Amino acid sequence: MSPQTETKASVGFKAGVKDYKLTYYTPEYETKDTDILAAFRVTPQPGVPPEEAGAAVAAESSTGTWTTVWTDGLTSLDRYKGRCYGIEPVPGEDNQYIAYVAYPLDLFEEGSVTNMFTSIVGNVFGFKALRALRLEDLRIPTAYVKTFEGPPHGIQVERDKLNKYGRPLLGCTIKPKLGLSAKNYGRACYECLRGGLDFTKDDENVNSQPFMRWRDRFLFCAEAIYKAQAETGEIKGHYLNATAGTCEEMLKRAVFARELGVPIVMHDYLTGGFTANTSLSHYCRDNGLLLHIHRAMHAVIDRQKNHGMHFRVLAKALRMSGGDHIHSGTVVGKLEGEREITLGFVDLLRDDFIEKDRSRGIYFTQDWVSLPGVLPVASGGIHVWHMPALTEIFGDDSVLQFGGGTLGHPWGNAPGAVANRVALEACVQARNEGRDLATEGNEIIREATKWSPELAAACEVWKEIKFEFQAMDTLDTDKDKDKKR
């Protein structure tokens, strides 16, 4: 290269490494209505200032790289770069900060959760300058929300399809989750459905294994549904898990379910992936199928408080990608779920508009405009004694799913289903009469046992069962103040 050429090429470009905060930390920035806003919990490495750490997150999740490159001059960084516009310390933690980052909408493909996450929670999570990084919340602007179809049907359409109103829906996961033959599996479904449940469910890891191929399971479960419907006069369903190794196979299973005339299929959206989930959601919308979503693998992502991604973000992403139900924790059962935090993302699933409320972990006001809502599913270690609390916590627009709490009944599956249905109806009636489920719940259940021997037997079996472990997912508080209290 001649000296003249070298001089021209280097005009306005200075090679080397410079601090991220010089370009990407902009505390004076005023966010736009069209920006995607993110709240990251940042734990910098020793010696890294929080402003530099926050700016590094903004850079590495948008336009930046580790060094200055000459092609920066071929585009408008001010238009496309992410901006860290705020840093605040986390109460009670010595070296944790909440970094607020704004992303221009043009960085993201329309209608693609996959593309959104590839940028926002991509390589930046392995960045050496950070000891740990967690995405706590996202604000999805209405301009971006409108590029998604969202849930195939939504809460009201599902109730109309099922002709069931004024109470939570009842479900049961068939156990043992693996090992049953298709015929025995179908028989277990039938017993639960005729006993009074609305749904039975494939467990998340039931796909198409040697002991029970998917087509056989679909056929026997469809038979169980139609037989139970004929006997009870109620519409019934079974969550037929269409999750498969390829998108083509997944859709083939969904097509077969539609041909059988069943009302609902299921997908493991995290292990299956957002691209597959959105494709299945579009198919279900076009073909009148409800879509139940299981969150298997979520705890790998959201369990640690200082690294990963909070479930409220995964819940928002699911509402965008599409699903009519999603598991959301129970507050009272065996699986993770602190009450205020759980209710925060339950509202994010169901409501049209949710105000910022840090007391429930909600960092941003979220407007879903016309996107349909998702029913939260309470499942995991729950039984009849939990029914008053579950009814009070989750309200009518929910699915209460008892696996062992149905199938573990000493008299069998159908009596287990009867016990749960009676307990639910008793709680709903008591609530409608103005009684306080939180304080009178046990009394309400005991009164109902007088006219339901099935419920009485269930209450006796599970009277001592408790899951007394501290939740990992808790709200941030000042630890020194807590000790003084």
Swiss-Prot record:
The disulfide bond which can form in the large chain dimeric partners within the hexadecamer appears to be associated with oxidative stress and protein turnover. The modification N6,N6,N6-trimethyllysine is found at residue 14. Transmembrane segments: none annotated. The basic functional RuBisCO is composed of a large chain homodimer in a 'head-to-tail' conformation. In form I RuBisCO this homodimer is arranged in a barrel-like tetramer with the small subunits forming a tetrameric 'cap' on each end of the 'barrel'. The modification N6-carboxylysine is found at residue 201. Substrate binds at residues 123, 173, 177, 295, 327, 379. Keywords: Acetylation, Calvin cycle, Carbon dioxide fixation, Chloroplast, Disulfide bond, Lyase, Magnesium, Metal-binding, Methylation, Monooxygenase, Oxidoreductase, Photorespiration, Photosynthesis, Plastid. Its EC number is 4.1.1.39. Belongs to the RuBisCO large chain family. Type I subfamily. This is Ribulose bisphosphate carboxylase large chain. It comes from Flaveria pringlei. Heterohexadecamer of 8 large chains and 8 small chains; disulfide-linked. The disulfide link is formed within the large subunit homodimers. Residues 1-2 form a propeptide.
